[in-house]
Amino acid sequence: MKEYKLSEILTIKNGRDYKNLKNGLYPVYGSGGLMCTVDNYLYERPSVLLPRKGTLSNIQFADSPFWTVDTLYYTEIDNHLADPYYLYYYLKQLDLTQLNSGTGVPSMTFDSYYNIKVNLPNIHEQRAVGQFLSVLDDKIQLNKRINDNLRASRAQSQTQFELCRGAAVNADVSPNLLTLDRSSTKVKVRRAA
């Protein structure tokens, strides 16, 4: 393990206004998360996105071209010293609220970030851990999408059930609907009309 200040392993850059850009494929991130997509990007390499204003605990990661607004810094990381994904997870577990420099809205300055000390293993270990965590994150995202699809499917099935239940209540007007004959001790299936 070796101790570094963040200033030794990365450069912090300011986000910019995106309002003059058109809709497109590149995500725009703010301190609250994904905002929209635009037709241009600020940076194309993997980057840890650090909140400047707002929710200081919402450290994000971008691994494809992106744009950030002025409430979010992006980082240019020295890949010889730090694996971006490993560094993302390392910083994510820190409590940054103690470094808050704002009086009203929580805020962080370049210097607040640059003075953070991190203990990093050698780059090969970082890459192995970073890759493992990346695979886990991908699996978690896949599971979330599966759960969302299951919820949507359940809601659709529930709607269909409600429609069928309504048809069963009105079986006398639906001659092709099968119903139960409960007039005797044995239950028989009969046509509705």
What are these regions (language model features)?
Residues 1-30, 115-193:
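Non-catalytic DNA-recognition/assembly elements of restriction-modification systems
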Residues 30-97, 101-105, 109-113:
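A short beta-sheet element
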